[in-house]
Amino acid sequence: MKFLNNSDIRIRVLVDLLNGPLKIRDINKKSLLSYSSISSNVHKLCDEGYVEKIHNSFQLTNLGLIYITILLDFRDVISTITDNSDFWLDHDISSLSIDDLNKLSSLEGSELIRCNSMDIYKTHKEFKRLFKNSRNLKVIFPYLHPEYPKLIRRLILKGIKVDLIVSRDILDGFIRDIGKDVVKKGIYDGNFSIKYLSHDIKIALAISNEFITVGLFKLDGTYDQNRLLLSNKKKAISWGLTIFDSYDDNALPLILDWFLDIF
């Protein structure tokens, strides 16, 4: 890796070759680097086993493909952490698995929504806007905000597909505030499911086909309502779906018969 990291030209060549074999003059046109610099570094890459010559073109070897993929992924992770360093520094990340953290590069380019003195409800308003425009939604709520059951209720009544996971201690409150009849209708109609976990949840997650939002708890144990990470990139949405699915696998479903008896 040191051989690659020490030269931006070599990395640029490998990136250009990710899309398939190229001649040196093709790399020259794409990169605007000097022909001699490209030629010299391409041959060094060949000597190290990262690139091979096929007829008059050059292509990545398996080794080159593996290394440049890892290197670009690592750079995205560093970019993700650096761009929002305070978000990752002073929050509880115990809700994320090692595998989730290994794939933080998926959040590269995310926007950090912050409340400020001019708009102390900025994150909440952004959350509401995203909810209202959703066509389907998967949500993990770690706490009961008075507005969120109302948002869920409206979506259910509009026939929007909603999958909800909450902790057991706020389950009753969510059902009460959404409305027993609406919950029952959503479950019967197949556009609403609600599951619960017996332990505390340390992440707020909302995912649709078009966005993902991530909220975390501060190190003092309180939920940070002033910062929200937002992305509309497919790889970020996929990252969030993986997390949701892992929680969903461990959550207990609301059994309709039991629900009717209790409520």
Give residue ranges: language-model regions.
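A short acidic, leucine-rich amphipathic alpha-helix
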Residues: 26-30
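PLD-like (HKD) phosphodiesterase/transphosphatidyltransferase domain
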Residues: 85-165
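Basic, amphipathic "hinge/linker" alpha-helix immediately C-terminal to the N-terminal HTH DNA-binding motif
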Residues: 53-75
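Short amphipathic alpha-helical interaction segments
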Residues: 32-44
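C-terminal regulatory/effector modules of DNA-binding transcriptional regulators
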Residues: 142, 147-263
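Short alpha-helical segments that sit at the start of domains
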Residues: 1-12, 37
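Short capping segments at the starts of secondary-structure elements
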Residues: 18-23
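Glycine-centered, phosphate/nucleic-acid-interacting loop/turn motifs that mediate DNA/RNA or nucleotide
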Residues: 49
